[in-house]
Protein backbone atom coordinates (compact mmCIF):
# COMPACT_ATOMS: atom_id res chain seq x y z
CA UNK A 1 0.00 0.00 0.00
CA UNK A 2 1.31 3.44 -0.92
CA UNK A 3 -0.30 6.49 0.74
CA UNK A 4 -1.58 8.94 -1.87
CA UNK A 5 -1.30 12.15 0.14
CA UNK A 6 -3.85 14.94 0.28
CA UNK A 7 -3.32 16.10 -3.31
CA UNK A 8 -4.16 12.70 -4.81
CA UNK A 9 -7.01 11.71 -2.49
CA UNK A 10 -10.25 11.33 -4.45
CA UNK A 11 -12.87 13.84 -3.31
CA UNK A 12 -10.46 16.50 -2.02
CA UNK A 13 -11.25 19.88 -3.60
CA UNK A 14 -8.65 20.46 -6.33
CA UNK A 15 -8.22 23.99 -7.63
CA UNK A 16 -6.13 24.84 -10.69
CA UNK A 17 -4.92 28.43 -10.23
CA UNK A 18 -4.33 28.78 -13.98
CA UNK A 19 -8.03 28.17 -14.66
CA UNK A 20 -9.45 30.69 -12.18
CA UNK A 21 -11.34 33.89 -13.02
CA UNK A 22 -9.20 37.04 -13.21
CA UNK A 23 -10.63 38.18 -9.86
CA UNK A 24 -8.70 35.35 -8.18
CA UNK A 25 -5.73 34.61 -10.44
CA UNK A 26 -4.23 35.68 -13.74
CA UNK A 27 -2.55 32.70 -15.45
CA UNK A 28 -1.70 31.25 -12.03
CA UNK A 29 -0.60 34.53 -10.38
CA UNK A 30 -2.83 34.82 -7.32
CA UNK A 31 -4.65 37.99 -6.35
CA UNK A 32 -5.37 39.02 -2.77
CA UNK A 33 -8.92 37.65 -3.19
CA UNK A 34 -7.81 34.10 -3.94
CA UNK A 35 -6.92 32.92 -0.40
CA UNK A 36 -10.27 34.22 0.85
CA UNK A 37 -11.97 32.15 -1.86
CA UNK A 38 -10.09 28.98 -0.83
CA UNK A 39 -10.89 29.45 2.86
CA UNK A 40 -14.55 30.20 2.10
CA UNK A 41 -14.82 27.17 -0.17
CA UNK A 42 -13.64 24.79 2.57
CA UNK A 43 -15.65 26.50 5.32
CA UNK A 44 -18.84 26.30 3.19
CA UNK A 45 -18.70 22.52 3.65
CA UNK A 46 -19.35 22.88 7.40
CA UNK A 47 -15.81 21.84 8.31
CA UNK A 48 -14.73 21.79 11.96
CA UNK A 49 -12.60 24.90 12.42
CA UNK A 50 -10.59 23.87 15.48
CA UNK A 51 -7.46 22.81 13.55
CA UNK A 52 -7.69 24.78 10.31
CA UNK A 53 -4.48 25.91 8.72
CA UNK A 54 -2.39 26.41 5.62
CA UNK A 55 0.64 24.59 4.26
CA UNK A 56 2.87 25.92 1.50
CA UNK A 57 6.55 26.30 0.66
CA UNK A 58 8.90 29.25 1.15
CA UNK A 59 8.37 30.58 -2.40
CA UNK A 60 4.63 30.73 -1.73
CA UNK A 61 5.20 32.37 1.65
CA UNK A 62 7.35 35.05 0.02
CA UNK A 63 4.82 35.60 -2.75
CA UNK A 64 1.95 36.07 -0.27
CA UNK A 65 3.99 38.37 1.97
CA UNK A 66 4.70 40.60 -1.02
CA UNK A 67 1.11 41.10 -2.24
CA UNK A 68 0.39 44.84 -1.98
CA UNK A 69 -2.57 47.18 -2.18
CA UNK A 70 -2.77 49.72 -5.00
CA UNK A 71 -1.17 52.23 -2.60
CA UNK A 72 1.83 49.97 -1.95
CA UNK A 73 0.90 48.64 1.50
CA UNK A 74 1.55 44.97 2.19
CA UNK A 75 -1.72 43.12 2.70
CA UNK A 76 -0.64 39.98 4.56
CA UNK A 77 2.94 40.66 5.72
CA UNK A 78 2.31 41.75 9.32
CA UNK A 79 -0.12 38.90 9.99
CA UNK A 80 2.21 36.35 8.38
CA UNK A 81 5.16 37.60 10.43
CA UNK A 82 3.05 36.58 13.44
CA UNK A 83 2.53 33.06 11.99
CA UNK A 84 -1.02 33.44 10.69
CA UNK A 85 -2.59 33.83 7.28
CA UNK A 86 -6.22 35.00 7.08
CA UNK A 87 -6.52 34.36 10.81
CA UNK A 88 -5.33 30.74 10.57
CA UNK A 89 -1.87 29.34 11.34
CA UNK A 90 0.36 28.29 8.48
CA UNK A 91 3.41 26.08 8.16
CA UNK A 92 6.15 26.21 5.55
CA UNK A 93 7.44 22.94 4.12
CA UNK A 94 9.88 22.86 1.26
CA UNK A 95 8.79 19.28 0.61
CA UNK A 96 6.00 21.02 -1.32
CA UNK A 97 7.76 21.47 -4.66
CA UNK A 98 8.17 24.44 -6.97
CA UNK A 99 8.67 23.42 -10.59
CA UNK A 100 11.86 25.13 -11.78
CA UNK A 101 10.66 25.15 -15.41
CA UNK A 102 7.17 26.59 -14.88
CA UNK A 103 7.72 28.49 -11.61
CA UNK A 104 4.53 26.93 -10.24
CA UNK A 105 3.88 25.50 -6.79
CA UNK A 106 1.05 24.18 -4.60
CA UNK A 107 -0.74 25.08 -1.37
CA UNK A 108 -3.04 23.25 1.01
CA UNK A 109 -5.76 24.49 3.33
CA UNK A 110 -7.81 22.37 5.65
CA UNK A 111 -8.66 20.90 9.01
CA UNK A 112 -5.43 19.10 9.87
CA UNK A 113 -7.19 17.11 12.61
CA UNK A 114 -8.80 15.23 9.69
CA UNK A 115 -5.43 14.06 8.37
CA UNK A 116 -4.83 10.71 10.01
CA UNK A 117 -1.27 9.42 10.50
CA UNK A 118 -0.77 5.88 11.71
CA UNK A 119 2.39 4.23 13.05
CA UNK A 120 2.39 0.45 13.10
CA UNK A 121 5.38 -0.11 15.35
CA UNK A 122 7.55 2.98 15.72
CA UNK A 123 11.17 2.78 14.58
CA UNK A 124 12.72 -0.67 14.22
CA UNK A 125 16.50 -0.88 13.76
CA UNK A 126 18.88 -3.70 12.91
CA UNK A 127 22.67 -3.63 12.89
CA UNK A 128 25.08 -6.11 11.38
CA UNK A 129 28.82 -6.57 11.02
CA UNK A 130 28.59 -8.88 8.03
CA UNK A 131 26.06 -7.27 5.69
CA UNK A 132 26.65 -6.44 2.04
CA UNK A 133 25.11 -3.56 0.14
CA UNK A 134 25.53 -1.55 -3.05
CA UNK A 135 25.89 2.23 -2.81
CA UNK A 136 24.41 4.84 -5.16
CA UNK A 137 27.50 4.61 -7.41
CA UNK A 138 27.06 0.87 -7.91
CA UNK A 139 29.99 -0.07 -5.65
CA UNK A 140 29.39 -3.14 -3.51
CA UNK A 141 30.49 -2.94 0.15
CA UNK A 142 30.94 -5.67 2.76
CA UNK A 143 30.77 -4.60 6.41
CA UNK A 144 33.09 -7.37 7.65
CA UNK A 145 35.80 -6.75 5.03
CA UNK A 146 35.70 -2.95 5.45
CA UNK A 147 35.36 -2.96 9.26
CA UNK A 148 31.95 -1.27 9.06
CA UNK A 149 28.64 -1.71 10.79
CA UNK A 150 25.53 -1.77 8.64
CA UNK A 151 22.33 -0.32 10.08
CA UNK A 152 18.83 -0.71 8.69
CA UNK A 153 15.95 1.33 10.07
CA UNK A 154 12.31 0.55 9.29
CA UNK A 155 9.22 2.53 10.09
CA UNK A 156 5.75 1.54 8.92
CA UNK A 157 3.50 4.58 8.58
CA UNK A 158 0.32 5.37 6.78
CA UNK A 159 -1.49 8.61 6.11
CA UNK A 160 -5.04 9.25 5.03
CA UNK A 161 -7.73 11.90 4.89
CA UNK A 162 -10.63 11.19 7.25
CA UNK A 163 -13.05 13.71 5.68
CA UNK A 164 -12.23 14.77 2.10
CA UNK A 165 -14.37 17.89 2.38
CA UNK A 166 -11.95 19.18 5.03
CA UNK A 167 -9.20 20.00 2.51
CA UNK A 168 -8.49 22.09 -0.55
CA UNK A 169 -5.44 21.52 -2.74
CA UNK A 170 -4.37 24.34 -5.05
CA UNK A 171 -1.87 23.73 -7.84
CA UNK A 172 -0.34 25.67 -10.75
CA UNK A 173 0.30 28.73 -8.56
CA UNK A 174 2.85 30.94 -10.33
CA UNK A 175 5.39 32.17 -7.77
CA UNK A 176 8.60 32.67 -9.79
Task: Indicate where each model-derived feature is located.
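Alpha-helical scaffold segments that mediate packing/assembly in large oligomeric complexes
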Residues: 1-41, 176
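Short glycine/threonine-rich loop-to-helix capping motif typified by GTGT followed
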Residues: 18-23, 64-71
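Long, positively charged binding patches that form subdomain-scale interaction surfaces
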Residues: 34-40, 59-63, 68, 83
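Short, catalytically relevant binding-site loops at active-site mouths
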Residues: 6-9, 59-62, 97-98
Amino acid sequence: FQPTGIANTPGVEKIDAKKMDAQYAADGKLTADFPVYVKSLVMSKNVDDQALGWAFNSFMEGYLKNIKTTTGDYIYRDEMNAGNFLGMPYKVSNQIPTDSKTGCTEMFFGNWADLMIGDQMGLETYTTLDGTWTDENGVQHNAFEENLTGTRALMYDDIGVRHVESFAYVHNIKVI
